[in-house]
Amino acid sequence: MSAAEKIALYWAYPFVRYALVVGVLIALCASLLGVTLVLKRFSFIGDGLSHVAFGAMAVAAVLGLHNDMPLILGITVVCAILLLRTGQHAKIKGDAAIAMISVGALAIGYLLMNLFSTSSNLSGDVCSTLFGSTSILTLTETEVGLCVALSALVLLTFILFYNKIFAVTFDENFAKAVGIKVKFYNLLIAVMIAVVIVLAMNLVGSLLISALV
């Protein structure tokens, strides 16, 4: 069998195609938003929100929810908004607040999974959640479709509002002076980064998202 035939055989498996599509879309969204977050001095927000998402996933598991996406996305979006809106003005500044939320959410998530989990393989469940070790192989067509739709929405939003996001990122005072709604665009950035993090959990796990964002 030639190399070309081996490659063709490899790509014949649906999970390989699904992983490629989802991985490329998530990497593209994360790279665009990552630059914005670094310039806003929130470079560790990806790591913090990924741990928040892990805690939310543990809560969903305890509640026995079959579709945990709405709960995880909702909690992650709320935390992202709180961090971006209060991190610059609170007594505890950005990175310190992120570190506190990150450690707290991770500890609460693992505690809940230990106390209330009905799984016989808790360590395996935690490992796959943190590192995405099995999620790559189990992506369904529905999950891929959802990822494509949400990634396209994030990219389209970023492109349409790029100039205003650029202004808010570099100088919020200037943005306010020229009439840009700074609070709204900070909210928009928070929602977009939360969406990307929740989507990425299915592929790379909650711990490795910080390498992308």
Tell where the protein language model's regions lie, with residue ranges.
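Membrane-interfacial amphipathic/re-entrant helices at transmembrane-helix boundaries
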Residues: 1-28
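Transmembrane helix-bundle core of multi-pass membrane transporters
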Residues: 6, 102-159
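Interfacial loop-to-helix junctions that mark the boundaries of transmembrane helices
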Residues: 10-19, 64-70, 91-97, 135-146
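Hydrophobic alpha-helical transmembrane segments
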Residues: 20-24, 69-74, 96-100, 144-149, ...
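Short hydrophobic alpha-helical membrane-embedded segments
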Residues: 23-27, 45-53, 73-77, 182-192, ...
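Generic alpha-helical transmembrane segments of integral inner-membrane proteins
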Residues: 24, 28, 32, 74-82, ...
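Short loop segments and helix-boundary regions at transmembrane helix junctions
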Residues: 35-120
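Helix-loop-helix "hairpin" substructures at the membrane interface of multi-pass membrane proteins
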Residues: 139-213
